[in-house]
Amino acid sequence: MTRLTHIDDQGRARMVDVSDKAETVREAIAVGFVRMTPETLALAITGAGRKGDVRAVAEIAGVMAAKKTADLIPLCHPLALSKVEVSVEVAEGGLAVMARVKLKGQTGVEMEALTAVSVACLTIYDMLKAAEKGMVIETVRLVEKTGGKSGAWRAE
């Protein structure tokens, strides 16, 4: 059975001690999607929404969120990230969000990538909610990670 690393032998939550782990280059990619009507998508594409350029603001929000992950997720380590790249692209039925996060360190950046995507999606919703309250944030997930003891992993 797999042991949960954030739970000690007494069942209490704890931050994992990474001091003995090797420093390696670690990277994670996460994705998400905000489904919306064609009319709302047109507002996002043209930047004609009431709050400005939806895609640009969401990308910046995602970068900021990745840097704040340790403040939002209780047992995450504060990390000196070397790269955070967030993109918001037009796709059929909505906006596709992707975050790529990288560092050289002792712990992975999966949570930073997932946090970046989640906050970018929430920002898209916030900026367009005046036009459509029924937007759906979906499929937020990790699609790839490299580095560290467990090595590379890719979603199927």
Curated annotation (Swiss-Prot):
Give binding positions for substrate. L75, C76, H77, M111, E112
EC number of this enzyme:
4.6.1.17
UniProt pathway annotation: Cofactor biosynthesis; molybdopterin biosynthesis
The record's Gene3D superfamilies line, in alphabetical order, gives: Molybdopterin cofactor biosynthesis C (MoaC) domain
HAMAP family named among the record's database cross-references: MoaC_B (MF_01224_B)
UniProt lists the gene as: moaC
List the SUPFAM superfamilies: Molybdenum cofactor biosynthesis protein C, MoaC
Q: Which InterPro entries match?
A: MoaC, MoaC_bact/euk, MoaC_sf, MoCo_biosynth_MoaA/MoaC, Mopterin_CF_biosynth-C_dom
Which keywords, in A-to-Z order, does the entry hold?
A: Lyase, Molybdenum cofactor biosynthesis
| The protein's name in its UniProt record | Cyclic pyranopterin monophosphate synthase
